[in-house]
Amino acid sequence: MTLNKLVLIRHGESKWNNENRFTGWTDIDLSDQGRIEAKNAGQLLKQAGFIFDFAYTSVLKRAIHTLWYILDELDQAWLPVEKSWRLNERHYGALQGLNKKKITVEYGEEQVQQWRRSLNITPPELSDNDKRLPIYDIRYAKLSLDQLPKAESLAMTINRIIPYWKGEILPRINNGERVIIAAHGNSIRAIITLLDQLSENELIQLNIPTGVPIIYEFNSQIKTIKHYYLSIVNKDY
């Protein structure tokens, strides 16, 4: 018997997604296409009869605005929303803002793929005086220095999400609340890794499209019964 459903969604296409640039913690907004994707996601959820009790998102506007558009389509703009830096995208360090094709030409396909897809390899860190460091951003002012990365591996991203997932999100799901999480490609990959206990190889192969709801159905022990993309024709990922 299904106890509950969880909805995960990666933000709609951002301006830097469109320009093929590393984004990470840089606060870039949705592109025109991204806004369309977010509204379409809201319409799909409405057609499927979804309503929610609580929403989570990151502190980055591309995810926040995606959630806005979805909740507006659902006529649930009033819904309680918690924003957390722990749901941010992976921090890509000194790669942030750089074009992926140009970086590939400079460093080679193998090196760039290691930075992007491996579990434990960290991209080049921001330097100590780089103004892109989170310590210069007011939204992170209450965090300790050891919580603020200069760059992150995928494993580091997963590790920062684990306490938030276990301490904040999972208890709501256990309590029967209907939850939606609007986040980022790598933070959603981290959550899916926790839900499905993915192997390293499975995680590396997992890609999350922009603006498409992922539905998880659970039993009474919060074990996954099934998961699928919500689209005109539903399919497993």
Curated annotation (Swiss-Prot):
Site (Transition state stabilizer): H184
CDD domains attached to this UniProt entry: HP_PGM_like
Keywords (A to Z) from UniProt: Gluconeogenesis, Glycolysis, Isomerase
Active site: H11, E89
Catalytic activity: (2R)-2-phosphoglycerate = (2R)-3-phosphoglycerate
SUPFAM superfamilies recorded: Phosphoglycerate mutase-like (SSF53254)
GO molecular function: phosphoglycerate mutase activity
Biological process, per Gene Ontology: gluconeogenesis; glycolytic process
Signal peptide annotation: none
Record-listed E.C. numbers: 5.4.2.11
Entries under Pfam families matching the protein: His_Phos_1 (PF00300)
Function: Catalyzes the interconversion of 2-phosphoglycerate and 3-phosphoglycerate.
HAMAP family noted in UniProt: PGAM_GpmA
Family of the protein in this entry: Belongs to the phosphoglycerate mutase family. BPG-dependent PGAM subfamily.
Subunit record text: Homodimer.
Xref: PANTHER family: PHOSPHOGLYCERATE MUTASE
Annotated protein name in UniProt: 2,3-bisphosphoglycerate-dependent phosphoglycerate mutase
Species whose genome carries this gene: Baumannia cicadellinicola subsp. Homalodisca coagulata
